[in-house]
Amino acid sequence: MEQAPEDQGPQREPYNEWTLELLEELKSEAVRHFPRIWLHSLGQYIYETYGDTWAGVEALIRILQQLLFIHFRIGCQHSRIGITRQRRARNGSSRS
């Protein structure tokens, strides 16, 4: 007869504790890169849409992650991750 495998892995942090820590880290990073009024408006939107629920926390985490990713990818002045924009000659001299 088959038996379920025993849980021999390391003890995991509770999901809600981990989620709240992640949200705090994202909020502190977002404050460095976006105007506070934008973040306040986003928080109001999330609260009006989801209320004070875990679904709202998860939605806020997802949106902040997406905003920060795009912000860094476009080329944040504070980061080395962004795309480096290169000026191209318009006279065709760089063509082979």
Swiss-Prot record:
Residue numbers bearing the Phosphoserine modification: 79, 94, 96
Record-level GO cellular component terms: host cell; host cell nucleus; host extracellular space; virion component
UniProt KW keywords: Activator, AIDS, Apoptosis, Cell cycle, Host G2/M cell cycle arrest by virus, Host nucleus, Host-virus interaction, Ion channel, Ion transport, Modulation of host cell cycle by virus, Phosphoprotein, Transcription, Transcription regulation, Transport, Viral penetration into host nucleus, Virion, Virus entry into host cell
Gene Ontology biological-process annotations: DNA-templated transcription; monoatomic ion transmembrane transport; protein homooligomerization; regulation of DNA-templated transcription; symbiont entry into host cell; symbiont-mediated activation of host apoptosis; symbiont-mediated arrest of host cell cycle during G2/M transition; viral penetration into host nucleus
A Pfam match: VPR
InterPro entries named in the record: RetroV_VpR/X (IPR000012)
Modification comment: Phosphorylated on several residues by host. These phosphorylations regulate VPR activity for the nuclear import of the HIV-1 pre-integration complex.
Main location, first listed in the record: virion
Segments for region (Homooligomerization): 1-42
Disulfide links within the chain: none
Subunit relationships: Homooligomer, may form homodimer. Interacts with p6-gag region of the Pr55 Gag precursor protein through a (Leu-X-X)4 motif near the C-terminus of the P6gag protein. Interacts with host UNG. May interact with host RAD23A/HHR23A. Interacts with host VPRBP/DCAF1, leading to hijack the CUL4A-RBX1-DDB1-DCAF1/VPRBP complex, mediating ubiquitination of host proteins such as TERT and ZGPAT and arrest of the cell cycle in G2 phase.
Name of this chain's protein: Protein Vpr
Organism from which the protein derives: Human immunodeficiency virus type 1 group M subtype D (isolate Z2/CDC-Z34)
Gene: vpr
